[in-house]
């Protein structure tokens, strides 16, 4: 039997996985069973590929996961702050 995870459980599980990689600058949004994980540019390279695999493996297949990497080496928090209007318009947060 597959256990259905609620938003809080999903967010907690992702934060736990990201914490293993000592990533401090990230953001998680869980909306209507969809997950948006904002990670720094450095996470595009290995060994962080394993993190992405772990995130996909830890969640139910019915949950859609999107991973966003802010460009130009900006911090995730800076990128979100600078682009908050556009991000809200696109309903990403």
Question: Regions from the language model: what does each represent?
Answer:
Residues 38-42, 70-71:
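Structural motif
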Residues 57-84:
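A short amphipathic beta-strand at an alpha->beta junction
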Residues 1-9:
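N-terminal presequence-like segments and adjacent domain-start helices
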Residues 85-93:
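Short acidic DE-rich linear segments
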Residues 43-49, 74-77:
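Short, surface-exposed beta-strand/loop "edge" segments at domain boundaries and coil↔beta transitions
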Residues 10-18, 45-64:
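Short, non-transmembrane amphipathic alpha-helical segments
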Residues 19-40:
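Short edge beta-strands and adjacent turn/loop segments
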């Amino acid at each position: 039997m597959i256990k259905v995870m609620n938003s809080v459980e999903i967010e907690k599980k992702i934060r736990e996985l990201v914490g293993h990689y000592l990533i401090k600058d990230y953001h998680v949004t869980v909306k209507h069973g969809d997950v948006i994980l904002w990670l720094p540019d450095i996470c595009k390279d290995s060994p962080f590929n394993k993190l992405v695999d772990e995130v996909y493996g830890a969640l139910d297949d019915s949950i859609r996961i999107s991973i966003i990497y802010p460009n130009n080496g900006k911090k995730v928090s800076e990128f979100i702050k600078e682009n908050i209007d556009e991000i809200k318009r696109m309903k990403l947060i």
